[in-house]
Each structure stands twice: as structure tokens, then as C-alpha cells.
């Protein structure tokens, strides 16, 4: 969900939770107890290069891959530069569509976190895309050069594969 600001998000959720139509939905037995726990929110700001590298999805369906990178202290700028100048374009060559890139701003690692979403034709193709990407000589060179002053990542990236719901604008 996109909001004008953090405060606007707060206002929007208050309005939503107090909406009579929503309350009526929650009162229906088939919607009781659906969630095992309360949803969590992560507030993010879009990176300055996100809109420039974004691709359209050619065919509906497929899978989305949400990746979270945590860098070593003071290395987020180097990681963003690598994505901006090299990685996003190399993704395109290997069947990965760039959807968006964000920086979290209210987590313990916010100053060192990049979160992005890419699209693949299917889960099996995602593995093939990554294999081709990591073998790409241009990627290998960009990685080597960006890490000339030391490794960038503090730990391996986290990744989650997702499917768009039938009501999602990403379908």
C-alpha cells in the first residue's frame, strides 16, 4: 500500500478499521479467525532509481521474488550504485523484470537495508534466471569492482517467492 506519509498511513488505517462496511465483513462467521497473528507493517521509501529501472510485466501470472539485503555499515550507497548502474539492467537480460526498489526506514537495520521486488515467468525459471545472472561476466565484474574495498553484504539476502492475488494490480 502506498501512502503520502507515515502519518497518512496511520490516518488511513484508523479510517479503515472504523469503516462500517469493513466491520460488517469482520462480523461474518466465515471471516472469523482467519489470521493466525496480527499483520506487520514495514514502511519504506522508494529509491531514486526505482522508477527508472522498472519494467512492465509482459505476460500475466508468474512469480514475484521479494529480496532483502542488509549491508555492512556505510555500504548501502555502494549497493544502491551497483543496482542503479549494473544489476537492474543485467537482470533484464536474464528474464527478471524489475518491479521496485525501496529502503526501509523504521527497522533496526534501516540505514543498511535494500528491499526489492522482481518478477519471473515461473519458479523454475527463477532458478535458471539466477544461475545465468551469477555467471554473467558483466555482473561478475560489477560485483568485483563494487567490493574492491571489502564485502558489501552483512549476511546473505533473504528471499520470499510470492504470487499476485487476483485483485492485485500486478497481475
Can you annotate each of these PLM segments?
Residues 1-141, 146-171:
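Short S/T/G/P-rich N-terminal loop/turn motif that feeds into the first structured element of a domain
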